[in-house]
């Protein structure tokens, strides 16, 4: 029975599923993550040598020697790491200032305690180099013995001796370079001597020896040379080693970059060791033992090679320091100065790209066929030739990767040895430090791009080959097995037959040993009936040997044994007078040599994943222990600006080069390489910690810069898309080109959801989203802040900025999961929980403090313009915030273009501004603003204006009749001028009183224009909503067609868009209710003819409750005719005042106050119901009528009559227009016919003569 699972366990299991990384479709632009395939190490270091009892005993003995030498090489590598990564301890230890210091004993004790383990390591290092030199010289002595000189020495053995030479060269250079090692030893020695730690003579002597060993430069080389020179014929053996290296280098018999560089170092150091007091390399060349011309050519091509970490060696230095260089100087071209083309990476890019393209195409063909056919096809179905193709492809790929990695390392090495200066590079400052001159200022832009591109090729190809690792591994094992078995069982059969037949026992024993060592017979044993084993010919039908096929590679010892025994057959030395080679036929020799060459790479290929990693390893680009040592403790670590991985990454970001943008993660991967190397090869935690600290800093910088760039890029696109096309065209005609942003490849980076860096999986998309969201919010915030620091006209610019941010958000939302722009806008506008936001508050603020008191309305243009004579004090605003272009319109050019567009809206407030206010404030904001404006109007009407009305009513004549026509217009003008003398001369009338009325008028006009704009917006909404509400336009009907049939077809066509039935069918009850309400509101909004302005007028009417506005009840019970007690009579007096023409240098009322003044007066008259009386009884209108009749023109009391009448006529037209608009809004609810209740019946008037009767 299945075990029961509790609910908690089940839920936790489901939660765990979230942690499973699911394969996604993100583009692959990052290097291969650490392989999860187990990497077995089949290299036994000859531990299994005793199993091969069938092999030749000499070579088994040689394998034993090999094994111990490999162990020594490994130990030497550990000492090299120890020296290279040594950091000075003594600098961190407090120093004893004087002998009287009380705590000096304690300091010395601590010094000894800390430094003793380190000094022990140095002591062990000194012993090791002695042992290693003795061991190496012992091997040389053994091989140079007179009786063994003719003996065959295998290439593998010579190569191991070559590795020893390389080890000595590296260790000596490291020891020379590290001053901190000597300082630490000196500090220890001082402390130990003070504490009398070293009392025994032997330990004192050893300490002295160590001091001398560390102090003497080239001590290891000197010891080695001294011991070698006493060995007779050592130069011959070294010549063999150098020749082997020349041969390997020339024929590319190496795979990893370190092997390539090792061959060159062995050539150089080998020549230096050979050219001593007892031997001369130039004499050896004369004997044709070595070819110096060839070596010179190699050293000329590649002048500098990596020695260890960031230490480099100039190969010519080995030649220059050799004993017989001076007299043979002219032979060498490599010692002359001048750069090799090898270091000009830009020139080699064409060749590298071609190689990359060719190989990638070939690899893609196989990769695709594996994907297409791999699932349905068994591996066994592949033919030998197909496996061979894959084998060749794997080898070719590794060689290419190795070649490119070596290329990068060689350029880097050259640059480290040849730092720049202020003369070569103008950007390099005088005080730049050595490492900075070697890295930061030492590469041109083209060189950086070339390095990035090669790096991307290496890492990209590593990914592709890594994906096919299992396919390659199988093909490699299968091919090696086939090649080995075919060669041993088939190819060697004929030579074996010949050897048996001709009784060549040595050759026969070697061939049989090879076959016994490696053959895997189909039947499990060698066929005993094979005629070749008896030296006989095959029968006429032939002798059939079936070679089996498996995917199993040979062991490392097996391969070594086979290759060494084969080599012994074709070698020029054999230990006897006659070589074994002479016993073999020509074709056999060629077959053996061919197999021997091919099998060289088998070891590398059998460890495919490890070799792949080594061929792509560029970890040394980060390590800088040598240069840190040169700073003598001034630097603990270099800043990121000097670090190669960041230099390359930052260069891509700074140049914004589109073709390189996708490679940016590859240069960051150098940190992965370095961290892996620090942990697995150097095994130093502190180095890893330093790399990690740099990565933390660099990645923050990377995300910061990248997100800023991406935001700016999409902002520029948004700004360009929304820029008026006519302006762009006009600018182009004028020769000022506003360019479109060049396309960049940020999309690929935006899709990266798991970037691998130092074992972390980073969601780059999420990090960029956070920064872009912040930038968008900052942009919105800035747009509103700019609006808050400017007047009402800048509402146009605010709307433009918000539109561009909206468009930027829309473009970015394709790749990033951003908050909705409306939510961001509400947050920036402080409108999340508050009922109204910053924009609404500022709009009202501007209306109240600047717009109402300082703007003049012009009914002809329908615009408000700033008054030329301000009555209120200057309004102080905050300074607009400074901002980078990407937070405004995107770029400087776009900022300029948009500024020029919005400058056209700067000098007025009109319908465009008010429409923008409507769109930005919405119903809620408009309601708030209007409510506040009504409060302003109320305070004015019930405050200052009321006081002025009361004051002016007192100076008005109690009775002022309209004079008869017979007086003529000049007389009437003089009469009114005299009657209204006090009003005309009232000082504050044309300033404070008119100013207050203008504010009321402007407030009213703003409400009216807002409603008009709102209506247009609502009509637009309605038209947009119509298709979704089943409101369809009437279709054109031709003759003979039926309207209802056509309409039904149209309805059927758009039925899928009809929203309410759709939500009623699919939505929740809450959604259905919302949909119905929305539908109803949209349909009814304009249909029911609601009017804001009418409500506002009604509200204002309630403010006019003081009796002064209407005056006392008329004595005749109908209306006041000649009495000046109602507001319209006061307004007539005011109108008479502002109709008087002004002097040449005075401002008119229109210039000072605009039409707002007239709107205020007319509104009060209309709301008081005094409109018609005003029309009939107005003083100015009466003068106009009389002047129109008599046409006189005189100057009365310095008032030109004709000019005054012209002004009266203009104001009469304006007043009529205002009354018409006001009456339209006030009577909109009254219908056409006035109700009967409003009609009053009066007795007909009776003539006075009859009245007395």
From Swiss-Prot:
Keywords: Actin-binding, Cell projection, Cell shape, Cytoplasm, Developmental protein, Differentiation, Neurogenesis, Synapse, Synaptosome. Involved in formation of membrane ruffles and lamellipodia protrusions and in axon outgrowth. Binds to F-actin but not to RNA. The lineage of its organism: Eukaryota, Metazoa, Chordata, Craniata, Vertebrata. It is found in: Cytoplasm; Cytoplasm, Perinuclear region; Cell projection, Lamellipodium; Cell projection, Ruffle. It comes from Danio rerio. Belongs to the CYFIP family. GO terms for cellular component: cytoplasm; lamellipodium; neuron projection; perinuclear region of cytoplasm; ruffle; SCAR complex; synapse. Its main location: cytoplasm. GO terms for biological process: axon extension; axon guidance; cell morphogenesis; lamellipodium assembly; regulation of actin filament polymerization; regulation of cell shape; regulation of translation; ruffle organization. This is Cytoplasmic FMR1-interacting protein 1 homolog. One of its GO terms (molecular function) is small GTPase binding. It comes from the Eukaryota.
